[in-house]
Amino acid sequence: MNTQQLKAILGAGLATLALTMTASAEPAQGRVIESADDFAVLSTRERVEPENRMVRERLETLLPRLMAETDLDMWLVINREYAEDPVYFTLVPQPSFAARRTTMLVFHRKADGTVDRLSVNRYPLGEPYQSAWAGGDLDAQWKALGELIVSRNPKRIGVNVSREWPVADGLTAALHDRLREVLPTEFAARLVPAESLVIRWLETRSQSELAVYPHIVGIARGVIAEAFSSRVITPGVTSTQDVAWYIRQRFESLGLPIWFFPDVNRQRQGVPCEADSPFCGGSGVIEPGDVLHTDVGICYLKLCTDTQEMGYVPRLGEVEVPAGLQAAMQTGNRWQDFLTGNFATGRSGNDVLSRTRAAAQKAGINASVYTHALGMFGHAPGPTIGMWDNQGPTAVQGDWPLYASTVYAIEGNIKQAIPEWGGQFVQMKLEQSALFDGERVIYLAGRQTSWHVVR
């Protein structure tokens, strides 16, 4: 892919970042972010227009292609108030907080490849949907849905039922039964699981989403930088829980929802980290000489992040982070390079895992890989590349192949002996949000290649 093609897909800013950060002597794509204040955050009201614009773009440009790719002529998304299908909110305009009564979305792919977007609802959704029912009671609504399906005569009708993928299993048993009841036997036989479409819909990023995603990740990294600084931490006073709550409240003040509570922990000389322990680190008051770790995730403009970074609290008289810890960061970055270097279109998550583990083992790196897709969910559907408690193949999710225009949490850890700590292991738990463009991996807001230092 040449420079102009990359810019056309990613936008000039992200393409420039990708093309210039590889020439440095430092680990590629490193970036220091100091504060979330360096990034604009829209008010709740201001978010509606860009969110709806991105939803419409996805419906117009992605959905027709993905329905053709997965060989579906029609896709039904049917749910009820307070029992919404996980995919529902990725399809409807904002502001929207719940399905209304029984809400039915119908997507019909026509012979020319375009997709009609229809709603069979008591409360019409408006743009970008066309209402296909004049109103009535619940029985009339179901009758109208059945008649609409028959009139369109689709050969393969996708419904959201799945044994293996939770996000593709949003059609409840009762609604599934009712759907079969209102369809002639011939049409009921055309119902097929839509799980492949749901996964592709949720994992694929549009051009507009890729333009804004680096900004969102930058906000998350900025809050981590604030938290791992003397603005928040007073050694000997501040606890790991204090820092976690700072992160929680900071995102709250920005109006940004978190999708899990922030984790903050510390590793310390004299508190062993065993080579075979899945995770190292404890809670308590932060002291000089501590190694800090945090894991945070936010969602903004319908896109989620997942980020882990490391910090250090210098001892009295220390000017630099100990050389052993700096070397451990470099090893962590090297492990990331092994992982991202094995990304290839069509390659399964299990294959990427196997290749990465082999490369790390050959290099003598004690590493663990547990990388996952990101997008409209923090733990989004897509290829699973290892799990913290399973470094072998993962059935089904691990067999899913990599596609272009998908985003991942490049997540895992390495353990390395620190000479300054008498050979005690330190665990470097690293995670950054990154785009796979079909040829290479680009960190959306750079990655951590140097320590946060609390001074």
Pin down the residues of each PLM region:
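N-terminal secretory signal peptides that target proteins for export/translocation
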Residues: 1-6
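Intrinsic structural disorder/low-complexity segments
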Residues: 7-8, 375
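Short amphipathic alpha-helical "recognition" segments used for binding
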Residues: 8-11, 415
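Bacterial N-terminal signal peptides
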Residues: 11-20
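Active-site neighborhoods and metal-handling regions in enzymes and metal-associated proteins
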Residues: 26-455
